[in-house]
């Protein structure tokens, strides 16, 4: 077991982000429902902007970047040592459009997401109790992944990587950009991928 400084800081980070006693059984229940982390590639896709279910001014993954993501996820699958008959993707995202697209594009690979609480943001001004709880559940479930594919400019992705101890996570390159999204509004149904 690695008991160096990095391991100590990971333990400390997990304590700081320690979920409440009410949330721990939810995380365990979701883990049991989703499946073993040994068979899981954890993927965090942070869209923001107009692709997010709740719009923001700042965009991360845009439509242009999104077009490349099925190929990036396929590359992660092809490079994985996880047996194909057991492999699944655990997806954490702020966009139901992303979930729908990856389910369609990556068949027959199972795409699994948290089934509890509400998809949204933990950003000040947009956070609700439900979205914060979902963020915690997602954070712990993604961090348990055998392999990771994370959004390069997302603080959530960096925390997940740090908590996981996985120094070799793959990245979806998605720099911050400004969007025409109106802060806090539900995504316009005319926006599609």
Show which residues each predicted segment covers.
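Short, aromatic/basic amphipathic alpha-helical patches
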Residues: 99-109, 159
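Short, charged/polar "capping" segments at the starts of alpha-helices
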Residues: 95-102, 182
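Secretory-pathway luminal glycosyltransferase catalytic domains
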Residues: 1-85
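Short internal beta-strands
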Residues: 90-92
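A donor-sugar binding/catalytic signature common to diverse glycosyltransferases
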Residues: 135-180
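Short, solvent-exposed loop/turn segments at secondary-structure junctions
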Residues: 46-50, 94-98, 154-156
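Leloir-type glycosyltransferase catalytic cores
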Residues: 175-193
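Donor nucleotide-activated moiety binding/catalytic core segment of transferases
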Residues: 112-145
């Amino acid at each position: 077991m690695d008991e160096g400084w990095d391991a100590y800081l990971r333990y400390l980070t997990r304590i700081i982000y320690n979920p409440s006693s009410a949330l721990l059984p939810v995380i365990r229940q979701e883990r049991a429902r989703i499946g073993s982390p040994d068979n899981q590639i954890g993927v965090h896709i942070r869209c923001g902007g107009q692709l997010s279910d709740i719009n923001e001014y700042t965009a991360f993954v845009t439509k242009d970047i999104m077009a490349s993501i099925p190929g990036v996820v396929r590359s992660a699958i092809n490079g994985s040592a996880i047996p194909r008959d057991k492999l699944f993707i655990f997806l954490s995202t702020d966009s139901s459009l992303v979930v729908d697209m990856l389910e369609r594009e990556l068949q027959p690979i199972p795409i699994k997401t948290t089934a509890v609480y509400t998809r949204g943001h933990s950003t000040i001004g947009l956070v609700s109790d439900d979205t914060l709880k979902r963020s915690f559940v997602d954070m712990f479930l993604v961090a348990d992944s055998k392999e990771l594919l994370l959004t390069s400019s997302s603080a959530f992705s960096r925390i997940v990587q740090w908590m996981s101890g996985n120094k070799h996570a793959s990245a979806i390159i998605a720099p911050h950009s400004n969007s025409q999204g109106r802060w806090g509004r539900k995504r316009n149904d005319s926006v599609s991928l």
